[in-house]
Curated annotation (Swiss-Prot):
Keywords linked to the UniProt accession: mRNA processing, Nucleus
Record's compositionally biased regions (Pro residues): 317-328
Record localization: Nucleus
Start-end of Basic and acidic residues biased regions: 29-58
Top-level taxon in the UniProt lineage: Eukaryota
GO cellular component, one term: mRNA cleavage and polyadenylation specificity factor complex
UniProt name for this protein: Pre-mRNA polyadenylation factor FIP1
Region annotation (Disordered) ranges: 1-105, 204-237, 292-328
Lineage: Eukaryota, Fungi, Dikarya, Ascomycota, Saccharomycotina
Residue spans of biased composition, Low complexity class: 292-307
Protein task: Pre-mRNA polyadenylation factor that directly interacts with poly(A) polymerase.
Family, per entry: Belongs to the FIP1 family.
Biased composition (Polar residues): 90-104
Protein species of origin: Debaryomyces hansenii (strain ATCC 36239 / CBS 767 / BCRC 21394 / JCM 1990 / NBRC 0083 / IGC 2968)
Gene it is expressed from: FIP1
Major localization listed first in the record, in broad terms: nucleus
Amino acid sequence: MAGKHSDDEDAYLYGSDDDNDQPVSKKQKITEQSDESQEKLSKTTAAKKSEVEEKDSLENSSNDEDDNDSEEDSDSDDDIEFVIGESAPKSGQTITTSGPQNDTIDAVTDMDAGGDKNATTTIVSNQADKGSSIDINSVAQLDGKPLTQVDLEKLKDKPWRFPGADISDYFNYGFDEFTWTAYCCKQDKLRGEFNPQKLMAQLMSGGAGPPPMPSGKSGSNNTPTNKPTAMSPPMGMPPMGMMPPGMPMMPGMPGMPGMPNMSNMPNMPNMPNMPNMPNMPNMPNMPNMNNMPNMPNMPNMPNFMNNSRPGQVPNFGIPPPPPPQNRR
């Protein structure tokens, strides 16, 4: 019994062999677990390292691409050439004309010979040949109707009556709706009354001649007669001051100014005492009227003018009329 107790005490105090074997197995388990954990750690670290390396490789590749792009940009920038002025003469020929220029291109011909293209451009100015196409005498039209005959009251829209509208945008020269209507009526009336062809026909027919001048009395009614004089125009011709504008001067008309060679007309007798008549050369002196051959002597005419005074009627030998009698 004593031996068992001692063994138990020794086992308790120092442990038994089984106990010594059991911790060894635990240590082995711990070492195995530690080995496994180390393997896991090594795997995780290896995975992390691989991820880091991949990231680094991606960053390096992106940096390399950026570097390549920058190098390409720099290379492309180096390839840029700045050319100032014309580097080569142009093959095209431009023909221009002097005078007012016109930007219209009339003809462009391309000549393809041997692969060379020479463009020939011809610029012809027709502005000098063409006159103005604006007729100042024509009346403007609105919807196919003369503007002076348009009734403003029949228009659907009257924008000049809108609030805030500027009337000068629709009527020029200070006109408004009412004054323009009056102006159009007056213009239509004047155009209807003034007909150049009708006026010319009246002048040629003698209807617009001067009023007759009383030159004498004939008959018992003492009506004045209009006798043609040397200075009056013939029938059917307008008087001197009433010639229409633009009518050419007709030759052979008596009393018309501006007739050339009036003094050199043949078979014109030398009329004495005519003012502004040039002296006719190689004309003999006219003898006295009383001593002209083959002419009877003219009787002495009474001197009526010697007894007259300024402002007094000459005495022709006719007794004066009797004084009026006072009638009571």
